[in-house]
């Protein structure tokens, strides 16, 4: 009986470790198994609507704007309005087909959102990774270092030269989602405050 119990315990332990991909280095006070459950639940969210604010601090320029973000699986519609970006800007598209519309300046197309924002708004933002970070998840295509809080949610994330601090979560429709987070890049600090989360599972 004891032998069987030990075997089952070992299997459960190995299964829990298998859920941690080799790309993730995990630390902190949270429970790795609970993190995997949370990660799997949040990963199923492939649609959302967000209303909030974004603030950016850089050596030569700073500003803030209201943020609207509509996500429908791989399609996104991100809108900024306010001093940041010189008025209003709208970023829409899906991987490989991105459109940026800037008030009083026109429409611009590119294959990556990062290139468009860098060229037209002088913003060096990792939009492709933000699709994951905004949900409190690491992007799956590169290595990351994760620090868990006592609730087994992300407290800190290091990935692709960026550091993300998750300062507050909110419970919305049964999902624990980031409400306030700060991103630190090279000579850039970004603050995101989400005032309204509307998560969706569209693939069901």
UniProtKB/Swiss-Prot annotation:
Lipidated residues (N-palmitoyl cysteine): 17
Source organism, top-level taxon: Bacteria
Residue positions bearing lipid (S-diacylglycerol cysteine): 17
Single GO biological process annotation from the record: protein transport
InterPro entries to which the protein is assigned, alphabetical: LolA/LolB/LppX, OM_lipoprot_LolB
Signal peptide: 1-16
Record keywords, A-Z: Cell outer membrane, Chaperone, Lipoprotein, Membrane, Palmitate, Protein transport, Signal, Transport
Pfam family, one: LolB
Subcellular location: Cell outer membrane
Any one GO cellular component localisation term in the record: cell outer membrane
CDD domains referenced in this protein's UniProt entry, alphabetically: LolB (cd16326)
Recorded topology in the membrane: Lipid-anchor
Quaternary structure and partners: Monomer.
Protein family (similarity comment): Belongs to the LolB family.
Summary of the function given for this chain in its UniProt record: Plays a critical role in the incorporation of lipoproteins in the outer membrane after they are released by the LolA protein.
HAMAP family xrefs: LolB
Protein name: Outer-membrane lipoprotein LolB
Protein source organism: Ectopseudomonas mendocina (strain ymp)
């Amino acid at each position: 009986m004891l032998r069987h119990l030990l075997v089952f315990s070992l299997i459960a332990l190995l299964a829990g470790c298998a859920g941690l991909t080799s790309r993730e280095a995990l630390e902190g006070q949270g429970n790795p198994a609970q993190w995997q459950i949370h990660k799997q639940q949040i990963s199923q969210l492939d649609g959302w609507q967000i209303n909030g604010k974004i603030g950016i601090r850089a050596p030569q320029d700073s500003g803030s704007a209201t943020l609207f973000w509509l996500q429908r699986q791989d399609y996104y519609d991100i809108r900024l309005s306010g001093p940041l970006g010189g008025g209003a800007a709208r970023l829409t598209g899906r991987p490989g087909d991105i459109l940026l519309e800037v008030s009083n300046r026109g429409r611009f197309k590119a294959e990556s959102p990062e290139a468009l924002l860098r060229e037209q708004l002088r913003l060096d933002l990792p939009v492709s990774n933000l699709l994951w970070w905004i949900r409190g998840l690491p992007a799956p295509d590169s290595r990351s270092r994760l620090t868990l809080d006592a609730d087994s949610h992300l407290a800190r994330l290091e990935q692709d030269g960026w550091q993300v601090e998750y300062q507050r979560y909110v419970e919305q429709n049964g999902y624990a989602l980031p409400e306030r987070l700060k991103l630190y890049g090279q000579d850039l600090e970004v603050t995101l405050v989400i005032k309204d989360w509307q998560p969706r599972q569209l693939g069901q």
